[in-house]
């Protein structure tokens, strides 16, 4: 294992950002506190301070897009890659949502490659990610160990700001399209089935263990499912070898022409009306 350069939480990336900025002479955004521990381990002076992180959208050539709105109040990350080397997980159209520093909708993580069934690489399947699943068919086919028979494939169609809102469109070609609208206090997700012969669509929104289930609302109704021992769905792994019971919001629909599944993700518990049009 790599020796940690700070005692921060595993998912706290400030030490890495500090170390990278100090090592490569890049200004550290002034709204990111520098990690004194990282600098001490690396024996480097503190980097210069730069402009604060601003709202906006960025996308990567490997098939991902990230957006930030509301002065950091809301941030999302969308995965929609086409692979040139072996995939790690089946996660096309996976969406992660944070409100400030709080995770609400999250990725399941890894947990373990080698544990006894059902935990041997169990969190790699599409069924435990929140990309839409059509007709119970995984968007990729795994073989034994790290072998793949069919690689998952998706793409970012567009990622741009529309005024103060960010809009990311991603799709599994000829299967499903996901449109993510990021506002200052909520995220609206519209999933549209493209496959002409599909008959059923399912989405499972895994919640962070600390997230309020009422933060995720699906137009037309959904059900909340608690994690159960022996079943991978509903579990969250913050780091390798660790797992915690959580819950997921599940929606299943019979596919009809022009059907869309609309989900609203909030940074607060709400019993108000559903804002399906991003009002």
Where are these regions (language model features)?
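Carbohydrate-active enzyme catalytic cores, enriched for enzymes
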Residues: 1-104, 159-163
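CBM-like, beta-strand-rich accessory domains located in the C-terminal region of large
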Residues: 7-33, 38-41, 115-279
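Short, surface-exposed beta-strand-loop junctions and turns on beta-sheet-rich folds
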Residues: 82-85, 111-113, 195-197
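Catalytic Cys-His active-site segments of thiol-dependent hydrolases/isopeptidases
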Residues: 105-110
């Amino acid at each position: 294992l790599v020796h940690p350069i700070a005692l921060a939480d595993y998912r706290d990336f400030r030490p890495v950002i500090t170390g990278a900025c100090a090592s490569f002479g890049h200004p550290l955004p002034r709204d990111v506190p520098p990690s004194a521990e990282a600098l001490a381990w690396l024996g480097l002076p503190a980097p210069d301070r730069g402009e604060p992180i601003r709202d906006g959208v960025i996308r990567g050539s490997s098939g991902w897009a990230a957006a930030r709105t509301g002065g950091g109040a809301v941030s999302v990350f969308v995965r929609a890659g086409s692979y040139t080397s072996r995939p790690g997980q089946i996660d096309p159209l996976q969406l992660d949502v944070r409100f400030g520093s709080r995770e609400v909708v999250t990725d399941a993580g890894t947990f373990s490659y080698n544990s006894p069934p059902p935990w041997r690489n169990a969190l790699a399947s599409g069924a435990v990610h929140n990309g839409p699943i059509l007709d119970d068919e995984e968007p990729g086919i795994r073989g034994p160990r790290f072998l793949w028979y069919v690689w998952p494939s998706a793409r970012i169609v567009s990622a741009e700001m529309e005024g103060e809102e960010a809009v990311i469109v991603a799709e599994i070609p000829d299967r499903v399209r996901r449109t993510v609208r990021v506002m200052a206090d909520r995220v609206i997700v519209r999933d549209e089935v493209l496959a002409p012969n599909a008959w059923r669509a399912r989405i499972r929104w895994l919640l962070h263990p600390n997230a309020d289930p009422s933060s995720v609302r699906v137009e037309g109704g959904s059900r909340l499912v608690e994690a159960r021992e022996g079943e991978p769905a509903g579990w969250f792994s913050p780091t390798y070898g660790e797992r915690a019971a959580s819950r997921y919001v599940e929606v299943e629909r019979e596919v009809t022409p022009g059907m869309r599944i609309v989900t609203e993700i909030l940074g607060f518990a709400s019993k108000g009306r559903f804002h399906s049009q991003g009002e």
